[in-house]
Regions:
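Class II aminoacyl-tRNA synthetase catalytic cores and aaRS-like
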Residues: 15-500
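Conserved small/polar residues in nucleotide/adenosyl-binding loops
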Residues: 2, 7-16, 497-504
Length: 504
């Protein structure tokens, strides 16, 4: 501290802003002969006897430090990787340049070293390694885990993305407003996290699953356009398509807006943001719109990955007169795979094994091949009559050298299993379109659905506007009512939105 004060570096509590004249990622050949100060963490130490080399790392890069002074070498011999140090020294040109890093043309000859924080000799795991590290160990030593370059860069990328979103929403006239975190519970799709009230024993706050009610209040209060990077808390089991615990979403609301107005905002913000941070191809708006029922029929799921070219077709009518008992009285879904006849029996057995696993739950997976010769072979070929073959070719697009997978079950079950089989086929056959983000809207969701207990419940939430307005609620069968609810889907992942009900 005294040394820093004597050099006129101001209050010691502000020294982090005065600790270095350069970062570890910005020095180059133009800085040769300059005296610089650097601070960071030791990534690697190489003791060659006559001199010691240190790779010094900070958020911005790595600089090689050379220690050839005897006194400094004694000090350096006690240093360990991941120790935090401050050095001053002279920039010189490297004799053996490293083209893999931006600072590879230079090195710094140290004339002073200050240890800011010494690390233990043995780390619980290597920081920058391709080896798998146990998650519980990573979480226990999170401060070390976050030094990992990939993870570190992901967090910085998130920061840049959030700034881009904020700037774009501001450009579009949205005001950023933070809504309360502690609130009353409201009906949502998952369980609430509850916080006991100290002042009111026996009563609880709920952490918001989404800022639904508060943003409605903002619109009623006359705020025209609102947004926030909203924290959301959902107490649900972790699944591949869920974000359990805590996550953040771009949340926005508009006054006096139609569904198309919302789409325009999404199509302004989303492609712009994606293109700024990826080299992949990004769909431009307007995004295609797929009705919910069509999505379920063609893809077996309401968040389809459009990079996968396979579709599901209902071929029940083809087998109406079939004597294949396994199909009798069932809904039959088919997935036609171009060039699928090239695969051997092992592939089909593996797909059957997947379909009948506990994860999927199919009773079986029928299949057959349509060879180049025009012959139907393998699997259930003996049940594919000439009439069925003709229908599959003429009405459903079965082409030569293809294979067909059949799922037979009760309607909803067949639909669900076919959706999972389609996804798995896309993965195993490497059919997904490469380096592209495919967007679509899933629209016309049912307002209500039957619960497992047979009662009518909201499909998404009670805040959405029914198509046909309040009159539809009074005159239509609840299960026939569609809602102004729509999901934005990208490569099989989903973002949910809807048009708010404003009538009572």
């Amino acid at each position: 501290r005294d040394r820093l004060r004597s050099r006129g570096l101001g209050d010691v509590y502000k020294r982090q802003t005065m600790y270095r004249t350069k970062t570890c990622g910005e020095l180059n050949i133009n800085n040769v002969e300059e005296t610089v100060e650097l601070a960071g963490w030791i990534q690697k130490i190489r003791d060659l006897g006559a001199m010691i080399f240190i790779d010094l790392r900070d958020q911005f890069g790595i600089t090689q430090i050379v220690i050839n002074d005897e006194e400094l070498q004694k000090q350096a011999k006690d240093l360990t990787t991941e120790s935090c140090i401050h050095i001053s020294g002279k920039v010189v040109e490297r004799s053996n340049k490293n083209t893999k890093i931006p600072t590879g043309e230079i090195e710094v000859i140290a004339n002073e070293i200050e240890v800011l924080g010494k690390c233990k000799n043995v780390l619980p795991f290597e920081i920058n390694t391709d080896q798998e590290v146990r998650e519980d160990l990573r979480l226990e030593y999170r401060f070390l885990d976050l030094r990992n370059e990939k993870l570190h860069n992901n967090i910085l990328l998130r920061s840049k993305i959030l700034k881009t979103l904020r700037d774009k929403m501001d450009e579009l006239g949205f005001a950023e407003i933070q809504t309360p975190i502690l609130a009353n519970s409201s009906p949502e799709g998952a369980r609430d996290y509850l916080v006991p009230s100290r002042l009111n024993p026996g009563e609880f706050y709920a952490l918001p699953q989404a800022p639904q009610q508060f943003k409605q209040l903002l619109m009623v209060s006359g705020f025209d356009k609102y947004f926030q990077i909203a924290p959301c808390f959902r107490d649900e089991d972790p699944r591949a398509d869920r974000a359990p615990g805590e996550f953040y979403q771009l949340d926005f609301e508009m006054s006096f807006a139609t569904q198309e107005d919302v789409f325009k905002v999404i199509e302004e913000v989303v492609p712009y943001t994606f293109k700024k941070f990826t080299t992949w191809k990004v769909d431009e708006g307007p995004f295609i719109k797929i009705p919910y029922r069509e999505a379920m029929e063609k893809y077996g799921i309401d968040k389809p990955d459009l990079r996968n070219p396979l579709i599901i077709q209902d071929v029940t009518k083809c087998f109406e007169d079939s004597d294949f008992k396994a199909f009798e009285g069932k809904t039959i879904k088919a997935i036609i795979v171009p060039n699928g006849a090239e695969h051997g029996r092992k592939f089909f057995d593996k797909m059957t094994e997947y379909a009948t696993s506990d994860e999927v739950g199919a009773k079986g997976l029928a299949w057959t091949k349509y060879e180049e010769s025009g012959e139907v072979t393998g699997g259930i070929a003996k049940f594919i009559t000439d009439d069925i073959k003709e229908q599959l070719v003429n009405e459903f697009g079965m082409s030569k050298n293809s294979s067909v997978f059949f799922i037979a079950d009760e309607f909803k079950t067949a639909q669900k299993i076919a959706g999972l089989v389609r996804i798995e086929l896309g993965k195993r056959l490497d059919l997904l379109e490469k380096d592209v983000y495919r967007f679509c809207y899933i629209v016309d969701f049912p307002m209500y659905e039957l619960s497992d207990e047979g009662t009518i419940d909201f499909n998404h939430n009670p805040f959405s506007m029914p198509q046909g307005g309040m009159e539809a609620l009074e005159t239509k069968d609840p299960l026939d009512i569609l809602a102004y609810q729509y999901d934005l889907v990208c490569n099989g992942s989903v973002s949910y939105t809807h048009l708010r009900a404003h009538e009572t």
